[in-house]
Amino acid sequence: MRLRLIAVGSRMPKWVEEGWHEYAKRLPTELSLELVEIPLNTRGKNADVARLIRQEGEAMLSKVQPGERIVTLEVHGKPWSTEQLATELDRWRLDARTVNLMVGGPEGLAPEVCARAEQRWSLSPLTLPHPLVRILIGEQIYRAWTVLSGHPYHK
């Protein structure tokens, strides 16, 4: 099974890269977790933010192949417990399609990306810093896998 986090933003601090890679490497080879970074467009004082978000959304969608699943991470998405995420992970595995987890930039996801989503997931009603979201997603995917495999990490 292939999971990809497609996230707007690049050049993250070292601790973010280390955190992400720590959880990605813990997963078994049959569950790959990869990161695809979409460069954040420069936001100047007079920038057309709607246009920039649309461009970022187009770049995100260009990384998705026909037939692949899109799951957006949104404040108004559905919150999942660890056990519910494990159930979703198992369903995704059985579905045998690549799953693309989409995280937008500072202003969120483009409407075009949200319109393509098969599922909408909310990590929290809180506004979370996007670098931290990457690590949280990696950790939660790893935790869900440990639930499914009976590993003692999740107690």
UniProtKB/Swiss-Prot annotation:
One of the Pfam families matching this protein, by short name: SPOUT_MTase
UniProt keyword rRNA processing, yes or no: yes
Gene Ontology cellular component annotations, sorted alphabetically: cytoplasm
Keyword Repeat assigned: no
InterPro entries from the UniProt entry: Alpha/beta_knot_MTases, RlmH-like, tRNA_m1G_MTases_N
Enzyme nomenclature, EC number: 2.1.1.177
Protein name: Ribosomal RNA large subunit methyltransferase H
Originating organism: Pseudomonas putida (strain GB-1)
Gene for this chain: rlmH
